[in-house]
UniProtKB/Swiss-Prot annotation:
Segments forming domain Expansin-like EG45: 27-131
Organism this protein belongs to: Citrus jambhiri
Localization, UniProt: Secreted
Gene: CjBAp12
GO cellular component: a single term: apoplast
Key words, A-Z: Disulfide bond, Secreted, Signal
Listed name of the protein: EG45-like domain containing protein
A GO biological process held by the record: systemic acquired resistance
Something else known: Accumulation of the protein in leaf tissues indicates a systemic mobility.
Induction: By citrus blight. Not expressed in healthy plants.
Tissue specificity of this protein: Expressed in the outer layer of xylem and the vascular cambial zone of roots, in shoot cambium, but not in leaves.
Xref: PROSITE patterns: EXPANSIN_EG45 (PS50842)
Amino acid sequence: MGVGTKVLVITTMAICLISSAAYASEGTATFYTPPYVPSACNGYKNDGVMIAAASYAIWNNGAVCNKSFRVKCTGATNQGTPHPCRGGSVLVKIVDLCPAGCQATIDLSQEAFSQIANPDAGKIKIEFNQA
């Protein structure tokens, strides 16, 4: 592979990474606590703790089951802690449907929420995209 081709490949990869970050969706996140089974996607299978439930807004008749999403806290809602974000992001797998009355776009496991925000906030603003 020539130098010109390598530069073209690296440039294309960089553009793809930048453009995917630019298309992150915005929403809100809350959290739920164990037990995490059964789940709408996998029944009694233990999927660990880095999981989440999708709201009807992204559920798409279960098409998001077992898909991974990167979630980043972007700020506070008008509830809870004024500066809840801890920095960074978390990778979660959608394994459930957030029940009727769900107050968020994504309902994270308590463990996942705690990695990106102070749980005392209860609800946060997020950016998310499928990983």
